[in-house]
A protein has these predicted regions:
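A residue-level detector for conformationally permissive "hinge/kink" positions
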Residues: 14-17, 112, 185
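Core hydrophobic alpha-helical transmembrane segments of single-pass membrane proteins
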Residues: 18-24
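Glycan-association/targeting regions that enable binding to alpha-glucans and other polysaccharides
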Residues: 24-153
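Juxtacatalytic substrate-recognition/specificity segment
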Residues: 152-210
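N-terminal Sec-pathway targeting helices
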Residues: 4-18
C-alpha cells in the first residue's frame, strides 16, 4: 500500500504521540490562553473597536467582537481555520442585539462532529461585520493558540518542536520529552521519506486530573 505525503506526515505525528504517551500519560500533542487584540479601523463608517479570543479548555473557544456604525449592524460572523497538516475551516454566526454599537459573542465547541481540537492547537480567525447600509468589514486574520488558561505556561523548544509545561520544577521532564520527540523525528524521517514543515506543539499536564 502506498502512503501519500500527507499520510506520511500524519503517520510521523502519530508515532511521536505514541512515544510521548509512553513517557507521560497526560500529553496533548498538536499544533495563549486568553489574549486581546485590536483590529484596524476600516476606512469607511463601519469600524471594529475590539476583538478577543478566549480559551475555555476543554469546552472550546469564546470569540467576542465590538463594532459600531452610523447604520444598524445586523450581521456578524467569525471565521476560523485550524492550522497544521490537516487544515479544517468553518464559520459561525455571532449572537448580539442589532444596533449602532454592538458586542457580539460566539462559542466554538471542541468535541463536536469533526471539530475536536486538543490543547496546543493553533487557529487562525477573523470577523466579518455588516450593517444595513451595505457596508462590510473583514478584520485581519489573527493567530491563536488554544491553551488551558488555568496555568502559566512555560516552553522549551528545539527546531519545530515545542513542549508546553507549567511549574519550573517540571522543566527537566519537559526537556526529556523534547529530546525524545526530536530523536523520534530523526529516526522516522528516513523511513517515511519526508522532512516535517509544520510546528509540533506538545502540551503536558503534571497530573491526570488536571
Amino acid at each position: 500500500m502506498k502512503i501519500g505525503r500527507d499520510g506520511r506526515g500524519g503517520l510521523l505525528r502519530l508515532l511521536l504521540i505514541l512515544v510521548l504517551l509512553g513517557l507521560l500519560g497526560a500529553v496533548y500533542p498538536v499544533g495563549t490562553g486568553h489574549f486581546q487584540v485590536h483590529a484596524q479601523i476600516s476606512p469607511g463608517d463601519l469600524e471594529v473597536l475590539e476583538q478577543t479570543a478566549e480559551s475555555q479548555v476543554p469546552e472550546g473557544i469564546r470569540f467576542t467582537v465590538t463594532a459600531r456604525s452610523s447604520s444598524e449592524i445586523d450581521d456578524i460572523r467569525v471565521f476560523f481555520r485550524i492550522m497544521g497538516s490537516v487544515r479544517r475551516s468553518g464559520y459561525t454566526n455571532m449572537e448580539f442585539e442589532p444596533g449602532a454599537q454592538v458586542t457580539a459573542t460566539a462559542f466554538v465547541q471542541s468535541g463536536g462532529t469533526g471539530n475536536y481540537f486538543p490543547p496546543g492547537t493553533e487557529l487562525e480567525y477573523s470577523f466579518e461585520i455588516r450593517d444595513k447600509s451595505g457596508a462590510e468589514v473583514r478584520t485581519q486574520r489573527e493567530l491563536f493558540i488554544y491553551l488551558d488558561d488555568r496555568f502559566q505556561w512555560l516552553t522549551v523548544t528545539s527546531g519545530l518542536i515545542t513542549v508546553y509545561y507549567y511549574g519550573e520544577e517540571l522543566q527537566g521532564r519537559a526537556e526529556g520529552m523534547l529530546n525524545a520527540a526530536g530523536q523520534t523525528l530523526t529516526l522516522m524521517m528516513p523511513v517515511l521519506g519526508i522532512a516535517p514543515t509544520e510546528p509540533l506543539r506538545i502540551v503536558t499536564y503534571d497530573r491526570y486530573r488536571d
